[in-house]
Amino acid sequence: MLTIADHQFSSRLLTGTGKFSNHNTMLQAIASSGSQLVTLAMKRIDLTRGHDNLLGPLQSMGVKLLPNTAGARNAKEAIFAAELAYEMLGTKWIKLEIHPDPKYLMPDPIETLIAAQHLCEKGYIVMPYVHADPVLCRRLEEVGCAAVMPLGSPIGSNQGLATETFLSIIIEQANIPVIVDAGIGAPSQACRAMEMGAAAVLVNTAIASSANPQQMAKCFADAVATGRQAYLAGLGAVNNHAHATSPLTGFLSEPSISSLAKSVNSKGG
């Protein structure tokens, strides 16, 4: 089970709600993924009409919603978005995202740490999206974050685990769940993240942009489960040189060769 704060999840695949062609496709994909923790941007929620045509169906599915602060450019804006999420949705769970650069959407480490400390002190369950920076992730754990969400590669890029070396260090050092977020573009990449020991992965673009989001979501679910089982089973060591799987000595010793030669000669005679 994946444990975040006081909540347990049987699925280790988190999904997002953006970039789908329509709401029905999104809902079908989320259902197919088996995801129990779904992110959504606060800026996409519209309650002015009495109900929201995105929020309602998600709530009816029984998934836990993880509002995010996407669009925030600094700590002040992110804190405001988190407080708004609490007022609108009644949850103190928040995926903290602060990326002032609209081109590459790189998270701002300084503003993220400032906002995380403030929100943790206010009792929020903070899950920050950050660079794959082991030092920063340690600091975020120290201020009380419930999990850290280091990127594999830029958001929406489908480039995979470009930061694998640093992700490994973060996973090794962390005492809270490490959820690989951003850039995962194929089920094999999600599987690899889980094999490394990640607690979970978050996938959005790779599912939403595929030709068949519902089927792709199921593929990711299977890959995440397989990767987790492989991690628990214990992967074999990686070596720089060959190791024979069968003995290379003994059967070619002089007595063996002599016996073989006699056998061949007797049959030939």
UniProtKB/Swiss-Prot annotation:
GO terms for cellular component: cytoplasm. It catalyses: [ThiS sulfur-carrier protein]-C-terminal-Gly-aminoethanethioate + 2-iminoacetate + 1-deoxy-D-xylulose 5-phosphate = [ThiS sulfur-carrier protein]-C-terminal Gly-Gly + 2-[(2R,5Z)-2-carboxy-4-methylthiazol-5(2H)-ylidene]ethyl phosphate + 2 H2O + H(+). It holds the Pfam family ThiG. One of its GO terms (molecular function) is thiazole synthase activity. GO terms for biological process: thiamine diphosphate biosynthetic process. Its EC number is 2.8.1.10. The active site is at 95 (schiff-base intermediate with dxp). Signal peptide: none annotated. It is found in: Cytoplasm. CDD domains: ThiG. The keyword Cytoplasm applies. SUPFAM superfamilies: ThiG-like (SSF110399). The keyword Ribonucleoprotein does not apply. Its main location: cytoplasm. 1-deoxy-D-xylulose 5-phosphate binds at residues 156, 182-183, 204-205. Homotetramer. Forms heterodimers with either ThiH or ThiS. Catalyzes the rearrangement of 1-deoxy-D-xylulose 5-phosphate (DXP) to produce the thiazole phosphate moiety of thiamine. Sulfur is provided by the thiocarboxylate moiety of the carrier protein ThiS. In vitro, sulfur can be provided by H(2)S. Belongs to the ThiG family. This is Thiazole synthase. It comes from Shewanella frigidimarina (strain NCIMB 400). The lineage of its organism: Bacteria, Pseudomonadati, Pseudomonadota, Gammaproteobacteria, Alteromonadales.
